[in-house]
């Protein structure tokens, strides 16, 4: 079954897009759940429109929940909306009130592509008691601190702004403020160190296409995980 429409969020204080795909058959027990996060230019329908998700979900035991988070990088924005709070705190309650979804950590995953991959990691690591699995595909930015320092240094140069994307620079300033001061949860490697020390690491799946623009960043990131002794697939 596919459901696509909008839901009112108290945290966002507005209606926001929401798409849900469920298995075709009812089951006696609770369903597992995966929150699927879209990329920078996508929306809640992206996974429905550009993947075979309904076919995969039809015979399974998992409900797939796809929120709309704009260009927020799934953060609580300095100038904007608290999308991380919505996705990690309010949305699961909304979905459990509509469907027979398990609240157990081992039955809950979060996944995403590009901006959504970064968002999945960020959400899973800021709420490690909520997610037993995180999947990140062609994710960016995996090194947020370095990215913001580069924008601080070169962002006012016309050639850099044109190459990097003026719209994206504005996005990051909306998220972190004009000074681009990162919040504590923005740097994924730092969060991994913290969650590992708490012995709360979720299962981690990482992948990236060989010709993807994020491939170099992906290789640097997985290399860092190897050195840190953090397991992933």
Predicted features by range, described:
Residues 1-233:
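Non-catalytic cap/lid and distal C-terminal segments of serine-dependent acyl enzymes
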């Amino acid at each position: 079954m596919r459901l696509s429409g909008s839901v009112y969020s108290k945290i966002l204080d507005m209606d926001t897009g929401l798409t849900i795909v469920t298995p075709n058959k009812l089951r006696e027990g609770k369903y597992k759940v995966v929150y699927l996060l879209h990329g920078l230019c996508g929306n809640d329908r992206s996974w429905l429109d550009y993947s075979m998700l309904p076919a995969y979900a039809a015979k399974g035991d998992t409900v797939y929940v796809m929120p709309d988070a704009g260009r927020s990088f799934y953060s609580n924005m300095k100038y904007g909306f608290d999308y991380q709070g919505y996705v990690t705190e309010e949305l699961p309650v909304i979905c459990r009130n509509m469907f027979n979804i398990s609240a157990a950590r081992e039955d809950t995953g979060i996944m995403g592509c590009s901006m959504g991959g970064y968002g999945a990691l960020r959400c899973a690591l800021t709420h490690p008691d909520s997610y037993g699995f995180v999947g990140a595909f062609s994710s960016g930015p995996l090194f947020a601190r370095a990215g913001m320092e580069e924008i601080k240094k070169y962002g006012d140069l016309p050639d850099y702004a044109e190459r990097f994307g003026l719209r994206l620079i504005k996005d990051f300033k909306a998220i972190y403020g004009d000074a681009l001061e990162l919040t504590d949860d923005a740097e994924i490697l730092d969060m991994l160190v913290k969650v590992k020390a708490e012995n709360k690491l979720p299962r981690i799946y990482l992948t990236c296409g060989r010709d993807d623009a994020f491939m170099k960043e992906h290789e640097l990131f997985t290399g860092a995980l190897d050195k840190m002794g953090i397991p992933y697939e």
